[in-house]
Regions:
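Aromatic (phenylalanine/tyrosine) cluster motif
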Residues: 1, 10-11
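Generic detector of N-terminal low-structure segments
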Residues: 12-13, 28
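Conserved short alpha-helical segments that host acidic/polar catalytic motifs at enzyme active sites
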Residues: 30-269
């Protein structure tokens, strides 16, 4: 089962009262959330946008992450993933067709010691640089907001995997506009300690296609993690919409040793 703890703190403005009220709600989510097939979740919409999956293999030995990008415009579809050190970056498949590199050219994956950072934008660099200065994942993301691509205001989604001394944990974050209102940024972090074998979580930018595109809602989806790296990679790629999928990155990390293997799939070849 999953336990979710939500803490809300209300502060009264200075000068009126020094009172504050704190409420804590602990809720057992077992009856409210069911684990679903990742394949079915991926194939259920034509345009989830960009997505991050993090979890653990069925044998419990490997930490898993996947990151995919999709596109509707020629500029968005004109991309490939390429290796960049221990991570990856996006680059234009045909440089002559690149119109606007902002928001589409970035490093989705970087490695900082025993931490693997996966995001849908240049906040990868923000997390890397500020965590390297001893700030936390959440503190780093406090300096960022959703993307300025009105009217969509695409959420910034991020994940971090921590492997140390045979232990594995991860966290996911989403920064999004306040129900389409860019005046406010809503910030959510979901932390998962001691991940269970054969399970993971999936977060993506959009609930589906639309105009404007509807931002992701709720908690990251609780999903099955199945197969070896090639089987998992094939399953994800095959269940993304054929017209809109662009690139996929998958990494399996040995929790005992920290060694990893990766796969990259690009539609543009």
């Amino acid at each position: 089962y999953i336990i979710m703890c939500v803490q809300t703190v209300f502060f009264i403005p200075a000068g009126r009262s020094n009172l504050w009220m704190q409420t804590t709600l602990s809720e057992n989510m077992e009856d409210d959330m069911e684990r679903v097939s990742l394949a079915k979740e991926l194939s259920s919409t034509t345009y989830p946008g960009r997505g991050i999956v993090i979890g653990r293999t069925k044998d419990g030995k490997k930490a898993v992450t996947a990151y995919f990008i999709m596109g509707r415009s020629e500029n968005s579809r004109n991309r490939v993933f390429v290796e960049d050190g221990e991570g990856i970056r996006t680059q234009a498949f045909d440089p002559s067709k690149l119109e606007d590199p902002s928001l589409i050219i970035y490093a989705p994956v970087r490695v900082l010691g025993n931490k693997t950072i996966v995001t849908n934008g240049d906040q990868t660099d923000t997390i890397y640089e500020l965590m390297d200065k001893q700030q936390t994942f959440e503190q780093a993301l406090r300096t960022r907001e959703f993307e300025p691509d009105a009217p969509n205001y695409t959420p910034r989604i991020s994940g971090i995997m921590h492997i140390d001394n045979g232990e594995f944990n991860y966290a996911m974050s989403i920064l999004k506009s306040n129900n389409g209102n860019p005046v406010a940024c809503n910030r959510y972090t979901f932390a998962y300690s001691a991940p269970v074998a054969g399970e993971g979580h999936f977060i993506h930018t959009y609930m589906g296609d639309g105009n404007p595109l509807p931002s992701f809602e709720g908690e990251p989806t609780w999903v099955d993690i199945e197969g070896d790296i090639d089987e998992f990679t094939d399953m994800v790629w095959e269940n993304l919409n054929e017209d809109n999928k662009v690139s996929l990155f998958v990494r399996y990390i040995d929790i005992a040793t920290g060694e990893y293997e990766s796969r990259i799939v690009n539609k543009n070849k």
